């Protein structure tokens, strides 16, 4: 009889997207049990696009500096063949993603108040990122050599 009581929230209206330390985090509620006061969030983590872009731009500028010292320098190109092309390659080489579930227990609060759940969930996610995934930039160490 228990499964009748617990209802599952399938719509993503309470999905949250935030960035933390260079990671893009997407979290959404997959189960919300009224009776136990527990809410389960599915969490997807990836490297945020602007990190890829920043690293790609650094590589592009470094290449341009090298080119300038050569006899026939090519023009600085920030178009598709430049930064975006490098960005695409970066994503292929360092495509990081992780998914996991976290459970947040309701504390004394208004029953349907979303805020405390989301706050607690974000707190948990941030500490998981701190302890488990480390610094985004470390993933791009020595990347110039392989691109």
Predicted regions: what is each one?
Residues 21, 48-49:
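Short strand-turn-strand beta-turns centered on an Asx-Gly dipeptide
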Residues 4-39:
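Negatively charged, low-complexity tracts enriched in Asp/Glu with abundant Ser/Thr
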Residues 56-147:
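Mixed-charge, Lys/Arg-enriched low-complexity segments
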Residues 51-55:
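Surface-exposed loop/edge segments in extracytoplasmic proteins
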Residues 35-43, 49, 92-102:
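Short aromatic-glycine-(Arg/Gly/Cys) micro-motifs in beta-strand/loop hairpins
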């Amino acid at each position: 009889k228990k499964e009748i009581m617990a209802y599952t929230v399938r719509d993503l209206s309470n999905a949250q997207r935030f960035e933390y330390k260079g990671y893009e985090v997407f979290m959404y509620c997959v189960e919300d049990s009224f009776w136990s006061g527990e809410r389960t969030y599915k969490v997807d983590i990836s490297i945020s696009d602007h990190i890829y872009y920043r690293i790609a731009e650094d590589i592009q500028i470094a290449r341009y500096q090298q080119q300038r010292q050569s006899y026939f320098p090519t023009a600085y190109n920030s178009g598709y063949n430049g930064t975006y092309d490098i960005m695409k390659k970066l994503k292929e080489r360092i495509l990081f993603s992780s998914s996991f579930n976290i459970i947040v227990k309701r504390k004394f609060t208004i029953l349907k108040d979303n805020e405390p759940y989301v706050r607690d969930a974000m707190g948990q996610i941030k500490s998981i990122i701190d302890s488990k995934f480390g610094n985004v930039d470390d993933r791009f160490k020595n990347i110039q050599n392989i691109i």
